UniProtKB/Swiss-Prot annotation:
Residues 8-282 form the tr-type G domain. Belongs to the TRAFAC class translation factor GTPase superfamily. Classic translation factor GTPase family. EF-G/EF-2 subfamily. PROSITE patterns: G_TR_1, G_TR_2. The keyword Glycosyltransferase does not apply. The keyword GTP-binding applies. HAMAP family: EF_G_EF_2_B. The gene is fusA. It comes from Streptococcus pneumoniae (strain CGSP14). It is found in: Cytoplasm. This is Elongation factor G. GTP binds at residues 17-24, 81-85, 135-138. Gene3D superfamilies: 3.30.230.10, 3.30.70.240, Elongation Factor G (Translational Gtpase), domain 3, P-loop containing nucleotide triphosphate hydrolases, Translation factors. It holds the Pfam family EFG_C. NCBIfam families: EF-G, PRK12740.1-3, PRK12740.1-5, small_GTP.
Length: 693
């Protein structure tokens, strides 16, 4: 089948926002106006098309990023709906990795909220161009210009309105287009009848002021436009649109639009802006990767003529077709029934069927082209972040960063029948979600699951019950602590055993130094002259990795340590891999005496919104929880407090805040970084883990 839409007419976009900003409703309206659905589903009624898991429909939030293909103005728009809840950060990250552009949805009463900041930061990291849609203009307290100001103040974004609202709250009835300088008035509830009129007289001065600001902001990103602007020449609408497009694609400018998805206003104009200002696959730089055979950097431009290269960004278990692998094609063409190479794993995979998804319904297709997003059935070894390529033209694309889980709990099956099913269920859920880890406690044999927050683990335990019919008892949430070294040291590990026949002999000297935060464990072999034979070097590294999994203070995994093997000795007969593994672990234990081992705890960025009169209480809460206030700002009659607080101190805080503020206070928290626990707390943790009172 020939390509239906050219690359210029393809858009891969994400819809991202803070929880409850109306993101799923916005996506629903896009599907409605692009002809994908005939009846609109409301999130608060639990009927949304994109939220297709039972847990999502019950909770009214989006958990997994469903991928959908729609058409608008002779363009194909592939949409990824991403969750706004902080516990599902990985879903946002893996979506951003394969998108070309995004629509950031704001609640125009609140403007930029904590999770907006998180996803904005991630989008900036991945260099994703964005347009902003200030939603809920019909809501009480909606304030478009306040929302725009929060983009400047909280995100330092060069964001400017390309539209202004006509009216707000119940009186929101239309939009002023600052490029055409016309008013778009909505005359019916479905938003399908729009009258284009002259701008009402009472809005004309404001419209002219903001058009002038828009022209100036765009001119600052383009030398030619700047010259015209300074010389007082008129900038045409076409030049202005071209300038906005160029600056948006270069991530130098963010157009801001307004509307109410719930009231069907502004969505079509936002779709026009997606086409006008967000990039096609041809507008973004060619994807880079490494050739696994030569280690040389290579690129794959977006073209059907190039060799096939794609990135798997999500695994899902579908109740009807089984395991689905979502992938983004960067170059080349793929046909169902063909073979590809998973270069990340070095394994050959057969593409059974290719499906294009619409929320949770599917259409089977024979061929998928560069720039497209699709799902494959039948891939056995592929996981999130793997590269799939032509067997003759190998390339490994940059993978997806997976954040460390911060919270864990114990799960135990209720019956013997549940025990066997639980292992399979947890394995499948971990395949789908890289931030979900399953471990067995070596000493107790208990199964411990870890994730990004309480809601994250709640949803996974719930899915285990519903989808896999496993009943389990769940323990109280625990913090995922980490351990590290804070000082450099050198330590010897010497292991010798002689008990008749062949003995065991391993001897190593290792230098341990603290590594940069987030760099994990790095091993360096600095042996010269073969004092430790080459075949035993991997055993030394393995011995360290295995020992570090259970720490040196309280049994928590060690992170951010560099180990340099620089000396040692061996025995011609008695040395073995096992002996060197044990020697390495003894070296780590020895190092712990002088390397200032420390326990690290997850620090959360907590944003608390309370009425003015409760500000004192909140400051007290933060201090009592070993937190530190990072900033405050007033918003109407409320105060917004930002603070860094240890996760260990935040359990049960919702109840405390509710009673202190008579139910009017709210808070959001998102993992920010790991930090050393104070000495007194460290001693308590060590005692507790050693079973002392």
């Amino acid at each position: 089948m020939a390509r239906e839409f050219s690359l210029e007419k393809t858009r891969n976009i994400g819809i991202m926002a803070h929880v409850d900003a109306g993101k799923t409703t916005t996506t629903e309206r896009i599907l409605y106006y692009t002809g994908k659905i005939h009846k609109i589903g409301e999130t608060h009624e639990g009927a949304s098309q994109m939220d297709w898991m039972e847990q999502e429909q019950e909770r009214g939030i989006t958990i997994t990023s469903a991928a959908t293909t729609a058409q608008w103005n002779n363009h194909r728009v592939n949409i990824i709906d991403t969750p706004g809840h902080v516990d599902f950060t990985i879903e946002v990250q893996r979506s951003l990795r394969v998108l070309d552009g995004a629509v950031t949805v704001l609640d125009s009463q609140s403007g930029v909220e904590p999770q907006t900041e998180t996803v904005w930061r991630q989008a900036t990291e991945y260099g994703v161009p964005r347009i902003v849609f200030a939603n809920k203009m019909d809501k009480i307290g909606a304030d478009f210009l306040y929302s725009v100001s929060t983009l400047h103040d909280r995100l330092q974004a060069n964001a400017h309105p390309i539209q202004l609202p006509i009216g707000s709250e119940d009186d929101f009835r239309g939009i002023i287009d600052l490029i055409k300088m016309k008013a778009e008035i909505y005359t019916n509830d479905l938003g399908t009848d729009i009258l284009e009129e002259d701008i009402p007289a009472e809005y004309l001065d404001q419209a002219q002021e903001y058009r002038e600001k828009l022209i100036e902001a765009v001119a600052e990103t383009d030398e030619e436009l700047m010259m015209k602007y300074l010389e007082g020449e008129e900038i045409t609408n076409e030049e202005l649109k071209a300038g906005i497009r160029k600056a948006t694609i270069n991530v130098e400018f963010f157009p801001v639009l307004c509307g109410s998805a719930f009231k069907n206003k502004g969505v079509q104009l936002m779709l026009d802006a997606v086409i006008d200002y967000l990039p096609s696959p041809l507008d973004i730089p060619a994807i880079k990767g490494i050739n696994p055979d030569t280690d040389a950097e290579e690129t794959r431009p977006a073209s059907d003529e190039e060799p096939f290269a794609a990135l798997a960004f999500k695994i899902m278990t579908d109740p009807f077709v089984g395991r689905l692998t979502f992938f983004r094609v960067y170059s080349g063409v793929l046909q169902s029934g063909s073979y590809v190479l998973n270069t990340s794993k070095g394994k050959r995979e057969r593409i059974g069927r290719i499906l294009q998804m619409h929320a949770n319904s599917r259409q089977e297709i024979d061929t998928v082209y560069s720039g497209d997003i699709a799902a494959a059935v039948g891939l056995k070894d592929t996981t999130t972040g793997d590269s799939l390529t032509d067997e003759k033209s190998k390339i490994i694309l940059e993978s997806i960063n997976v954040p460390e889980p911060v919270i864990q709990l114990m799960v135990e099956p209720k019956s013997k029948a549940d025990q066997d099913k639980m292992g399979i269920a947890l394995q499948k859920l971990a395949e789908e979600d890289p931030t979900f880890r399953v471990e067995t406690n070596v000493e107790t044999g208990e199964t411990v699951i870890s994730g990004m927050g309480e809601l994250h683990l709640d949803v996974l335990v719930d899915r285990m019950r519903r989808e896999f019919k496993v009943e389990a008892n769940v323990g109280a949430p625990q913090v995922s602590y980490r351990e590290t070294f804070r000082a450099s040291t050198q330590a010897r590990g010497f292991f010798k055993r002689q008990s008749g026949g062949k003995g065991q002999f391993g001897d190593v000297w290792i230098e341990f130094t603290p590594n940069e935060e987030g760099k994990g464990f790095e091993f360096e072999n600095a042996i010269v002259g073969g004092v430790v034979p080459r075949e035993f070097i991997p055993a030394v590294e393995k011995g360290l990795v295995e020992s570090m999994a259970n720490g040196v203070l309280a049994g928590y995994p060690m992170v951010d340590v560099k180990a340099k093997l620089y000396d040692g000795s061996y025995h011609d007969v008695d040395s073995s891999e096992t002996a060197f593994k044990i020697a390495a672990s003894l070296s780590l234990k020895e190092a712990a005496k002088s390397a200032q081992p420390a326990i690290l705890e997850p620090m959360m960025l907590v944003t608390i919104t309370v009425p003015e009169e409760n500000l004192g209480d909140v400051m007290g809460h933060v201090t009592a929880r070993r937190g530190r206030v990072d900033g405050m700002e007033a918003h109407g009659n409320s105060q917004i407090v930002r603070a860094y607080v240890p996760l260990a101190e935040m359990f049960g805080y919702a109840t405390v805040l509710r009673s202190a503020s008579q139910g009017r206070g709210t808070f959001m928290m998102v993992f920010d970084h790991y930090e050393d626990v104070p000495k007194s707390v460290q001693e308590e943790i060590i005692k507790k883990n050693k079973g002392e009172d």
